[in-house]
Amino acid sequence: MAELACFCYPHLENDSYRFIPFNSLAIKCMLTAKVDKKDQDKFYNSIIYGIAPPPQFKKRYNTNDNSRGMNYETPMFNKVAVLICEALNSIKVTQSDVANVLSKVVSVRHLENLVLRRENHQDVLFHSKELLLKSVLIAIGHSKEIETTATAEGGEIVFQNAAFTMWKLTYLEHRLMPILDQNFIEYKITVNEDKPISESHVKELIAELRWQYNKFAVITHGKGHYRVVKYSSVANHADRVYATFKSNNKNGNVLEFNLLDQRVIWQNWYAFTSSMKQGNTLEICKKLLFQKMKRESNPFKGLSTDRKMDEVSQIGI
């Protein structure tokens, strides 16, 4: 995760702003600079290489002292920064909006995936600039539309029906902020269209999840799509979701946290996110992840007979 101010800076032209991507040498200069505390939140002028991000975001970049940040010296950083600028420059951002826009925390890996989709000649985003920019504006939280299958970050499709598409995420192969744990495996489910979904299509999805992905929890980050994650990583997701939710509220980026279909979501996660929305502390919310929940009656009678027991998946073992 990183703020948009880590990728670009605003340049005032007439009554609105044009956004310009940072170059890696300017960032490198900022990372070595001694800056007064009062100037930590201001864009840094490297003198030689142009404007750099505010020093308060130093931890967002990979350095000798911090291996968890972005690999900003890779070509992928520039591609992501350029893509963000293209999207922001396609809309009008005024002086009253600019601070709010740049403070938004975005998924670095999501944006890298959109770059990969853009470069894939077989992908619809390669052929449609309008759909590409729409996908980016959704990814950076500027659009109120949810991420659907056409505007999704992408990955490898492992399941699809008339209503849903399930993607295996490819973060292990990333350049900008790769997942280093070689045991990482995670999926994302997007709706094909943002409209009411028939019970039969929900039932098909639940059957697929129950039998092929029974070692995983189905959760949501509140953005209109599902994530299918290992139970061992749920607490980590909870920390990130809670931190982003609080940060957005603090900065005035109040977005509706979409709890999605309770029949699909893991019971404990639904309880966690509901508690978070009520304003409870992280400690109180996380207790619900490890609490034994009363099993609800099956909303789809006969679902367990849809597949034979010898078809139960070994994925995740």
Curated annotation (Swiss-Prot):
Gene Ontology molecular-function annotations: ATP binding; metal ion binding; nucleoside diphosphate kinase activity; ribonucleoside triphosphate phosphatase activity; RNA binding
SUPFAM superfamilies (UniProt xref): Rotavirus NSP2 fragment, C-terminal domain (SSF75347), Rotavirus NSP2 fragment, N-terminal domain (SSF75574)
Biological processes per GO annotation: viral genome replication
Taxonomic superkingdom: Viruses
InterPro entries membership: Rota_NS35_C (IPR048306), Rota_NS35_N (IPR048573), Rotavirus_NSP2 (IPR003668), Rotavirus_NSP2_C (IPR024076), Rotavirus_NSP2_N (IPR024068)
Cofactor: Mg(2+)
Main location: host cell
Major enzyme class: hydrolase
Family the entry assigns: Belongs to the rotavirus NSP2 family.
Record note on quaternary structure: Homooctamer. Interacts with VP1; this interaction is weak. Interacts with NSP5; this interaction leads to up-regulation of NSP5 phosphorylation and formation of viral factories. Interacts with host DCP1A, DCP1B, DDX6, EDC4 and EIF2S1; these interactions are probably part of the sequestration of some host SGs and PBs proteins in viral factories.
Cited function: Participates in replication and packaging of the viral genome. Plays a crucial role, together with NSP5, in the formation of virus factories (viroplasms), which are large inclusions in the host cytoplasm where replication intermediates are assembled and viral RNA replication takes place. Displays ssRNA binding, NTPase, RNA triphosphatase (RTPase) and ATP-independent helix-unwinding activities. The unwinding activity may prepare and organize plus-strand RNAs for packaging and replication by removing interfering secondary structures.
HAMAP family recorded: ROTA_NSP2
Protein name according to UniProt: Non-structural protein 2
Native source species: Rotavirus A (strain RVA/Monkey/United States/RRV/1975/G3P5B[3])
